[in-house]
Regions:
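N-terminal post-signal-peptidase region of extra-cytosolic proteins
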Residues: 1-14, 38-52, 85-90
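Glycine-rich catalytic cores of cysteine/serine-nucleophile enzymes that process amide/ester linkages
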Residues: 21, 33-60, 66
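Short beta-strands and strand-coil junctions in structured, solvent-facing domains, enriched
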Residues: 24, 46-47, 69-70, 113
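Short, conserved beta-turn/loop elements at beta-strand boundaries and strand-helix junctions
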Residues: 30, 67-71
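Exported/periplasmic cell-wall-interacting domains
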Residues: 72-171
Length: 171
């Protein structure tokens, strides 16, 4: 990948590619396609800026996998399970985009684009995570995060590890 070469970092065994235009996440292992997932990115225009609620683009790294061992549909707040499945939450809470099942926390790798200053993916708490609104997958629906179905994010979290690259493309 050209960006990896420019940044002078090693490619990782697993590569996740998110297409904002197609609302898909592509998983590659050692350069071979593993699986394609239907995803959702931000309802607002893509953006790397703080408080924009846009999905940031460029090269990222999965810096933490959170929630391994938690049941499907578990709701997280502040990256901690709250002890409720999304279907057990009050109606007003269910209206929100909840963070469910697993969290792959992201950190940007491109200084000035998605790392540092007011354009820092990690400080913006942009994740790849499950959603309580699986019916919205395939179209922009999030507040900046990348959303997958609950079973899909569990499966993905079981296959990738911290340090894996995730590239978010506007195409």
């Amino acid at each position: 990948m050209k960006v990896v070469e420019q940044l002078k970092i090693e490619e990782t065994q697993d590569l996740l590619i998110v297409s904002v235009k197609q609302q898909r996440l592509y998983h590659q292992k050692e350069g071979k396609s593993v699986k394609t997932y239907v995803a959702s990115t931000s309802l607002k225009a893509p953006s790397c800026k703080e408080d924009s609620l846009g999905t940031p683009w460029g090269l990222h790294e999965v810096c933490e996998v959170i929630g391994v061992g938690q049941p499907l549909g578990m709701v997280f707040q502040g990256r901690k399970p709250i002890g409720l499945h999304h279907w057990d939450c009050e109606e007003d809470m269910q209206q929100k985009n909840l963070i469910t099942s697993r969290i792959l926390r992201l950190t940007g790798l491109q200084e000035g684009l998605n790392r540092g200053g007011d354009q820092d993916t990690f400080k913006r708490f942009v994740y790849l995570h499950g959603t309580n609104h699986e019916d919205r997958l395939g179209r922009p629906a999030s507040s900046g995060c990348i959303q997958l179905g609950n079973q899909e994010v569990i499966d993905l979290a079981n296959q990738v590890s911290s340090g894996s690259h995730l590239f978010i493309s506007l195409n």
